[in-house]
Amino acid sequence: MEPSATPGAQMGVPPGSREPSPVPPDYEDEFLRYLWRDYLYPKQYEWVLIAAYVAVFVVALVGNTLVCLAVWRNHHMRTVTNYFIVNLSLADVLVTAICLPASLLVDITESWLFGHALCKVIPYLQAVSVSVAVLTLSFIALDRWYAICHPLLFKSTARRARGSILGIWAVSLAIMVPQAAVMECSSVLPELANRTRLFSVCDERWADDLYPKIYHSCFFIVTYLAPLGLMAMAYFQIFRKLWGRQIPGTTSALVRNWKRPSDQLGDLEQGLSGEPQPRARAFLAEVKQMRARRKTAKMLMVVLLVFALCYLPISVLNVLKRVFGMFRQASDREAVYACFTFSHWLVYANSAANPIIYNFLSGKFREQFKAAFSCCLPGLGPCGSLKAPSPRSSASHKSLSLQSRCSISKISEHVVLTSVTTVLP
């Protein structure tokens, strides 16, 4: 992991402290106990870090598991966008369950305790999860861009989404093989290597100093800078399309005010009083679709923004360290250590933030989360069902929804019919 300032290189008995007896038989054991007591045991602020990691671990695992269950058990939620959201949740579960505990131990002890094999596997899975997350967010942005800005150019289907997800994992597993190839485990204190794994480090080993500069420059561009730039342009066009233009066939006053319940009745009466009911229903359906697309776009923009903010510190620090060679002789070691440690925590916090975003910005996910928690926590109310509603109840709900949505159009139709009957002889 990245905060690896060579622990043990600065170790030794501090000046002014009592020197140990000259090489007693148990000198190495005493030395290890000294290091554990004065160096490895978590400090007060590190206990705060441990608590933060535990909170992220619980929220990320529970939240992303609920996201997967909600889509799996509800056929009406199996949309193209939700398929990609589930894939993002699977990547978050992977990195949380496997990589987070190892990262926490490395950040606290500054030692790699998991041996040579996992030194290659865990960083490799970490890099794969980053690639999967970036590619998934890119495919979501591309799908929304086609659906909203160019609906006639490409038809997105669930089958194509599943194929894209398989391609995302295949590409990510392939392009991150160099990350596993260069990882090696070594001991800072070779004389203690046979007795303890403390002060072992898992770091990259390159044949030439130029290779890591090229690799990490490309890694930063491919997994962060270029995708975020393209996604920002896509969402900018989506924003202009959804918020900058009116619905075709309607007046601008209606489009500006359709979200305001207090003005909706008057505007609809003014704009639709001369239209028959089918056109009014078509207009309301168009407004409903516009509202749903705006909510989805808003949620996805927030997910992308949080991802960019959470991955920005570690991306910049990696470039500074690997490309420009900084932090090798850091004068303020504690500050550098704190920066890397916090940046690691932010990466995992992003995995916990996504389900929270879905809960606040998606009514369907919020309903499923509430149903799941009501089953586990009786105090929250009656236990709901995570399964999709029956056809009869769904039809009844749809009928009630249509009735509420069309109540205003019925008022307009009543005004039209009244005026017609008064004019007729």
Curated annotation (Swiss-Prot):
GO CC terms of this entry: plasma membrane; synapse
Q: Which PROSITE patterns match?
A: G_PROTEIN_RECEP_F1_1 (PS00237), G_PROTEIN_RECEP_F1_2 (PS50262)
Q: Where are the transmembrane segments?
A: 47-67, 83-105, 120-140, 161-182, 214-235, 299-321, 337-360
Q: What residues does suvorexant bind to?
A: 318
UniProt xrefs under SUPFAM superfamilies: Family A G protein-coupled receptor-like (SSF81321)
- List the GO biological process terms: cellular response to hormone stimulus; chemical synaptic transmission; feeding behavior; neuropeptide signaling pathway; positive regulation of ERK1 and ERK2 cascade; regulation of cytosolic calcium ion concentration
> What superkingdom does the record give?
Eukaryota
Q: Which UniProt keywords apply?
A: Cell membrane, Disulfide bond, G-protein coupled receptor, Glycoprotein, Membrane, Receptor, Transducer, Transmembrane, Transmembrane helix
Glycan attachment positions: 194
- Entries under InterPro entries matching the protein: GPCR_Rhodpsn, GPCR_Rhodpsn_7TM, Orexin_rcpt, OX1R
- Cystine residue pairs: 119-202
Which ranges sit in the Cytoplasmic compartment? Answer: 68-82, 141-160, 236-298, 361-425
- Chain ranges sitting on the Extracellular side read 1-46, 106-119, 183-213, 322-336
In chain numbering, where does the site feature Important for responses to orexin fall? 36
Domain comment from the record reads as follows: The N-terminal region is required for orexin signaling.
PANTHER family, alphabetized: G PROTEIN-COUPLED RECEPTOR 15-LIKE (PTHR45695:SF32), LEUCOKININ RECEPTOR-RELATED (PTHR45695)
Instruction: Give any extra note attached to this record.
Output: The antagonists suvorexant and SB-674042 bind at the cognate neuropeptide binding site that is situated between the transmembrane helices and accessible from the extracellular side of the membrane.
Q: What family does this belong to?
A: Belongs to the G-protein coupled receptor 1 family.
Task performed by this protein? Moderately selective excitatory receptor for orexin-A and, with a lower affinity, for orexin-B neuropeptide. Triggers an increase in cytoplasmic Ca(2+) levels in response to orexin-A binding.
Q: What is this protein called?
A: Orexin/Hypocretin receptor type 1
Origin species: Homo sapiens (Human)
